[in-house]
Each structure stands twice: as structure tokens, then as C-alpha cells.
Amino acid sequence: MSQLQMKLLRRKIEKRNAKLRQRNLKLQETSDTSLSQPQNGDVPKETGKGGKVKKALKRSVPVDSAEAQSGGMPEETLENGKVKKSPQKLTTLANGEAAPTPPPDSEVKKKKKKKRKMANDAGPDTKKAKTEESAEACEEPEDDVKKADDSEVPSLPLGLTGAFEDTSFASLSNLVNENTLKAIEEMGFKRMTEIQHKSIRPLLEGRDLLAAAKTGSGKTLAFLIPVIELIVKLKFMPRNGTGVLILSPTRELAMQTFGVLKELMTHHVHTYGLIMGGSNRSAEVQKLLNGINIIVATPGRLLDHMQNTPGFMYKNLQCLVIDEADRILDVGFEEELKQIIKLLPARRQTMLFSATQTRKVEDLARISLKKEPLYVGVDDDKEVATVDGLEQGYVVCPSEKRFLLLFTFLKKNRKKKVMVFFSSCMSVKYHYELLNYIDLPVLAIHGKQKQNKRTTTFFQFCNADSGILLCTDVAARGLDIPEVDWIVQYDPPDDPKEYIHRVGRTARGLNGRGHALLILRPEELGFLRYLKQSKVPLNQFDFSWSKVSDIQSQLEKLIEKNYFLHKSAQEAYKSYIRAYDSHSLKQIFNVNNLNLPQVALSFGFKVPPFVDLNVSSHDGKLKKRGGGGGFGYQKTKKVEKSKIFKHISKKPADRRQFSH
């Protein structure tokens, strides 16, 4: 327990002891008065063998004085005999009156030490109960009557993290600046989530931290509150340069973290800024020259400034935060991170926050966490890897009916807030154009959009009460989009961890609720095994196929006649096949098992378009998968209908097409 917490406890105990002394004096006066006027004659004298007068006293003391001695406890308690017998000994005065004798000081001290030791030795489960006992032992040396309840005594820290049982933000009042607490209150937060309550105190003490928690568990506030407190305590000024760096994997997450930081800094005067790819570099340089105390950044742009902006002062850095560490490594920032860590001063506090712990994250922890780090894993003992308020399931759907199922589902839930995940940018682009064309308004976010467009769309969807957002995995990490009702995974994720991040966009916060739907082909059901191993429970959703909109013929006519949709559908189909071919779980998502004509139907094609894919054959030669040039199958002499070889020689290929 820290000194601050001990002082707090001592102060409480001293106040209570003062009150108890006054009460005990009154009790003694009352007992003296009642004992001097016994109801049943004189008080019996002490026996020659040193016998005590307790029994006689018990008969002679009136009811009022008995209640007084019991500390004002209800009559039921007295009748049931639950009041502890006082350890005070009675002696007979010369005039025959009995008076209580207080126990010697040494005995009281022994009891205090003994009970304190018992409280300190207690495990995390029993510590709160033991603490109350120890507090009562300190507070009531003269009157050992048992209390029914004691809510004033603060509970001691639990576990390794030093976090109080009290999870309200108000409990941080002695550790966190009042301006920060005021901002938290204005944001509407009353209680800390588990990751916050386990992380904030050790981070305020300056510990290095490696934290793992489910998506939507409140990791952002868990690191922002301590870093703001660090800057405030050090009285950082713009001329001191940058004191805190917060790294985010995507621009959207960086913007969101910056937004939360902006709200927390409402009542502070320190400078803060956002640095990310896609924004005006010269404006960022000017801000850095003026001095930014807290920077939220994406790794690529940050490294660029560290290497090429001479006036960027980062040598005074006190703290480095890496948010969504596993995602930063996944999207190819490993080298940039290593270079950034080398350039930063070695004496600093480091925090790594992540939703999943991978080997790469452990490697990053080894090179970035200098001091003995504290590991906080709030979900390690949980049976389920996803949040409790999430109802999740899957639907088995053949390839040719995938779009019909999606269209029916979105049409039915158009008044709700829905996110649909695709495997490629081109697939998002095509479905965005198609659905809007057929009067089902949707939004889209993908990596090939310009940053301004991505930002506008992101905030538009965040602020909307209902709507449909089509996206790639760029939106699956860390983004806190409020009140998402459904997560639909139209294309299956690359692995179970990616599934967890995708569904983490819904059912966020303490009492969040949401639904998740995974669409699988019959050949892909083996993926459920991997999800089960990753503690993801899925039930099969019932779907009435008779209610599915049969718009296949209209879709095919539309794609055939509309040139722009036709080109977009071709690119989407090709990117879907290529993404499928690059899947990490090839034993389940095997591109050779795809029925291309059926897959093509879901994109509105009667005949599959040609796709240039290099896949290894049994004889070691390179082969090509896909449909024919333009609309038909491309046929060569040594190929089955479902496969197309890659052209190795420069001989002219057979370009015949099926009529349609």
C-alpha cells in the first residue's frame, strides 16, 4: 500500500477513535449511575477465591444501561445474545460500587498488531473483509462491541495492480488533477471499467505496462488519464517539446483517440496535436516547431518527422504509448516501430495496449519495455473471448445466394446501425455503388479512398442513429462507433483474432448490446472449429430462405447493361478470388474448392470473368485460376474446365468465348 493510502486510512481511524472515546466516556458515566442504584439490593461482594461479579451485575443493570453498553444496538441483537462480551474487567471499589477497569495498553497494541498482520496476509478474495476487521480493531480498543456494518472504512488494494475495490472515478481524486476529473464527469463517465481500474493506478506510479483486454473495454481512457496527469505534474510547456507519444495503427483510430484526448484536455492549458498520413505535412511541421506536449500519431508519418523535421524536439519524451500494438505490427509498421524506439530516449515510461497477445507483441514488449513491466490481462480467466452483451451466430449460405441474403438482410435492417465487412477494397467499392444504385443507401470506408473522404464518412456514420457502413478491416481496429446494432461478416476473416476485432465494433462499454452475423459457405464450416479454440461461441441462426428476395435475374441484367457497374463488378470478383487465395487458413479457405460459376452469380455474372492467379500445381508448374477472357472461360489444351493455366510461353492463346 502506498504512503498516501496509509495516510488516508490513518486519518479516518483517528477521527473515528476520537468519536468513540467521547461515546465511551458517556457510557462509563451511565454505567456508574446505574450501578450505584441497583434494583435488587446491594451488589454482591467479590468472593474470596477471586470470583467475578459479572452475573450479579447482569441482573442488576437496568435495560437502558445495557443498551448503552452495547453501543445502541437494536433489542433483537441483545436478545439473541450476539453482542460480544466486553474484555473490560470489573473491580469492586471501597464503597462497594463496581467500576470497569480498562485493559493495559500492551494488550491493545498486541491485538492491533495481530489483526493488522491477519489483514495483510489475507488473499485477494478475503482482503476486504479482513481490512474491515483490522480497522475495527484499531478503532475500538475500549469498546469491542461488534458493528453490523462499516461503510466508512476504505477498502485496501486488491491484487498486484494496486487498484481499489471502489471503481468510481471519484476515488482517484487524490491522484488525478481535478480538471481531468471534471472533464471525465462532463463526458458522462462515472465508473471505471476493469482495464481502467487495474491500469490507471500503476501507470500513475510510473510503471511500464503490457495490457491485454477485449475490444470495447475502455483501453483509451486507461492510458490517456495517466499521460495527461504526467504532463500536468511535470508542468510541461510548449518550449519543452513533446512529452508523450501515442501511436495508433490507422488514421481513423488516431483521429478517435485525439478526439477523446481533446475532451479530456478541455480544462488544461497544455498543447496536444494529431500527426498522420494524408494530412497537410507543412502545417504539422509548424505545429511541431511551436511545441506539442502530447502527440497522437500514425507510425509512418511520425518517423518521417523524426528523421526530417529539424525543429521536432522529442528528446524530452517521458512516455510512449502503443495502442493496438498487434494491429500496428500486422499492417507492416514493425520496422518503423523499431526505428522510432531507437530514436526515443531510453529513460521513459512505456505502455503497450492490445486486444490480443501475439508473439510479435511479446517481441515488441522486449525491446520497448525497459523496466520490469506489469502485465494486466483482464480477460485471461474468461471462458469467452468476446464481450458478454454480444449475441453472435452464423448462417450457412451457398456461394450463388450470398448477395441475395445480404440484400434481404440489409433491407430488413435498414433502420438499424449495421457494419458489413468485406475482404477487399474493390469489393466494398462495387457493393457500395450497386446498393446505392438500387435504392438501398449505404456508406463505405476502404483503404483506397482519400483521407478526407474516409474522415467524412467515418464521422457521418458515428453521428447517425441508423445506417449501413460497408468496410474492410481498416475499420475493424479500435474504432469506437456508437451503438452499432449488427456486425455482418460477408467475407470471412483471415483468422479468429480478426473475427474478434471485427465483432468488437458492437456491444462496447459496460452494458453494451449487439449482434454479429458470420456468413459461411458449406465448405467453410471448419472455421467454426478455430473460433471455438479461440473461445468464440457461435450458434447457427435460422434463416427463412423463402423470404429471401429473388432479384438474381434483375441483378444479372443490370450488370450486363450498366457499363460502370459491370467494370466495378469485374474488379470486385477478381479481388475476392485473390483475397480468398491469400487466406492464411488454406485447409478451409481453399481457392481450388471454389465453384467459380456460383461465385460469379453473386457478383451478377452469368459466366465468370477471367482472373489471373498463380497457384502451385502438383507437378510444380505455375497454373492460373479464373474464368475466360471477358465473359467466358478461357480454354487451353491441358486444363480442366474449372482451372486455367498461366501462359509461360509467348504462343498465342485460344481466345474463344462462350456465347451468352
Curated annotation (Swiss-Prot):
Region (Disordered): 16-153
Main location: nucleus
Entry keyword set: ATP-binding, Chromosome, Helicase, Hydrolase, Nucleotide-binding, Nucleus, RNA-binding
Domain Helicase ATP-binding as annotated: residue spans: 200-375
Motif Q motif mapped to chain: 169-197
Pfam family, one: CTE_SPB4
Molecular functions per Gene Ontology: ATP binding; ATP hydrolysis activity; RNA binding; RNA helicase activity
Basic and acidic residues compositional bias, start-end: 124-133
Functional summary from the UniProt entry: ATP-dependent RNA helicase that plays a role in the regulation of R-loop homeostasis in both endogenous R-loop-prone regions and at sites of DNA damage. At endogenous loci such as actively transcribed genes, may act as a helicase to resolve the formation of R-loop during transcription and prevent the interference of R-loop with DNA-replication machinery. Also participates in the removal of DNA-lesion-associated R-loop. Plays an essential role for establishing pluripotency during embryogenesis and for pluripotency maintenance in embryonic stem cells.
Family statement: Belongs to the DEAD box helicase family. DDX18/HAS1 subfamily.
Protein name, per record: ATP-dependent RNA helicase DDX18
Organism: Mus musculus (Mouse)
